[in-house]
Amino acid sequence: QGVEIRGSELTVVAGQPAAGKSAFALATAIRTGVRTLYFCADTAAWTMAVRAIAMISGVGQDVIEQRLADDSTYGQGAFDDLRHIRWCFDSAPTLDDIDNEVAAYAEVWGADPELIVIDNLIDVSDGDDEWGAIRRTQKELKFLARETGAAVFVLHHVTEAFKVEEGSAPSRSSILGKDTRLPALVMTITNEDGYMGVAVVKNRYGKCDPSGRSPQWFTF
């Protein structure tokens, strides 16, 4: 569909719980191979390690988990393919925390990250006004993208009240907060029978289908 995750722009990927958002983000970070700063507030370090080794090795996660439990050195070679990723596992990072981590990254590595992953938006947004906090956070993350030149890749939720039809992904209108004005690219995710469906529901630079009824399907 001519989709590009662009530097200096905000990209949002939304889906219901267990739809595969984190797996999609991790695969993106691994396969692009660019300098990445990954804020993983929603998933523990152990789980991310298992997922990453499974993706790189092609071995199932249950097998990887058992092998790591038996031998903590198992999979060390796989981490050679992850050297371009730096992690932050703070469970509730603030916008100031994110700014500080980006500044520290630039100081240590001599350049800003090219990809910044935020997993996920709700864990960063705070305040009594949830929807207002989501909008404010997106505004600040868009500014961060412009300031650093990084592609800022943010995971978000859709309402669980939305019924995802077979063969479709969630619609743009089902995204929590319903405000998608700031991102250049918005994708929604679903999964069916071992396949991941990714729909482009907003695309400032190309085609999209806000209904989510035109997903592309991938094995995962």
Language-model-detected regions and their locations in the chain:
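Core recognition of P-loop NTPase motor domains used across DNA-transaction enzymes
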Residues: Q1-G7, A78-L82, L144, C208-S214
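The Walker A/P-loop phosphate-binding site
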Residues: Q1-V59, D179
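Hydrophobic/aromatic beta-strand patches that form the interior of the parallel beta-sheet core
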Residues: T11-V13, L37-F39, C88, F153, ...
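Generic hydrophobic alpha-helical scaffold/packing signal
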Residues: A14, L26-A29, A49, I53, ...
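Phosphate-binding/switch region of NTP-binding enzymes
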Residues: A18, R136-F220
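Flexible loop/turn segments at secondary-structure boundaries
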Residues: G20-K21, A44-M48, L95, D123-G127, ...
